Amino acid sequence: MPTRQSTSWVFTLNFEGEIPILPFNESVQYACWQHERVGHDHLQGFIQFKSRNTTLRQAKYIFNGLNPHLEIARDVEKAQLYAMKEDSRVAGPWEYGLFIKRGSHKRKLMERFEEDGEEMKIADPSLYRRCLSRKMAEEQRCSSEWNYDLRPWQEEVMHLLEEEPDYRTIIWVYGPAGNEGKSTFARHLSLKDGWGYLPGGKTQDMMHLVTAEPKNNWVFDIPRVSSEYVNYGVIEQVKNRVMVNTKYEPCVMRDDNHPVHVIVFANVLPDLGKLSEDRIKLIRC
């Protein structure tokens, strides 16, 4: 299976007792982290490596035997801010090295939006809506907190997400009764950097959203009213890493070297006539 590589990673390190000392070395360009408490004590942090090809194994190695959960940081500036947010902070933040910003056209568009959103709304309503959507998502991400004890099924999901994704496994969270915390957990999970949220829908609409962020992990939160119409085709496209967008300007996106996590939250069991049983990791609420 291809190995994930990146310059920038975000990490969460759970601990008990004394705050762990992080032994960063010359392979690290920059790091920031802080002590947070949301149900339990943990360090939340962000690391930039000097090498653009730092693997997950190499990133874990610098923690000298500690066992953090690491994910690739898609937006370095947002990741840095999230690692130093005031909400849930107990101590810190602490920094190591020199942070390197990335110039981006996206940031320039957001600067235009912030400076004169009303003008953008008139001149380009579509661009305005996209910028507004991104801003609202960032605000939610920065203010997101999980102030509940994890239920056993939620802990099981988190353990699965600590493993490397593959091209087949689909995590299916099944809870027929309702009020088990599926949607709340799905929304919280989708606010993590590198994750997207889909409530179901038509293939064209869903794939248009997926191909806008093709490297994301994806949460499919299926409403009870749509349980009979789960879009298995989209789920398989995302897992198989060959994604077809036929809306507006048809295109095919291939991402063969980058498997992602896919989680379905539903009130129904998977239809084994539409997904092979060996693909499903079933978790019951």
Swiss-Prot record:
Sequence motif RCR-1, residues: 10-13
The CRESS-DNA virus Rep endonuclease domain, residue ranges: 3-99
Residues involved in a divalent metal cation binding: E36, H42, D87
One example of a Gene Ontology biological process annotation: DNA replication
Active site positions, chain numbering: Y82 (for dna cleavage activity)
GO annotations of cellular component type: host cell nucleus
GO molecular function: ATP binding; ATP hydrolysis activity; DNA binding; endonuclease activity; metal ion binding; nucleotidyltransferase activity; RNA binding; RNA helicase activity
Gene3D superfamilies: 3.40.1310.20
Cofactor requirements of the protein: Mg(2+); Mn(2+)
Keywords on record: ATP-binding, Covalent protein-DNA linkage, DNA replication, DNA-binding, Endonuclease, Helicase, Host nucleus, Hydrolase, Metal-binding, Multifunctional enzyme, Nuclease, Nucleotide-binding, Nucleotidyltransferase, Transferase
Family designation: Belongs to the nanoviridea/circoviridae replication-associated protein family.
Subunit structure: Homooligomer (Potential). Rep binds to repeated DNA motifs (iterons).
Remarks, miscellaneous: The genome of nanoviruses is composed of six to eight segments. In addition, some isolates contain subviral DNAs.
Entry comment, domain topic: There are 3 rolling circle replication (RCR) motifs. RCR-2 is probably involved in metal coordination. RCR-3 is required for phosphodiester bond cleavage for initiation of RCR.
Protein name: Para-Rep C6
Natural source organism: Subterranean clover stunt C6 alphasatellite
Gene for this chain: C6
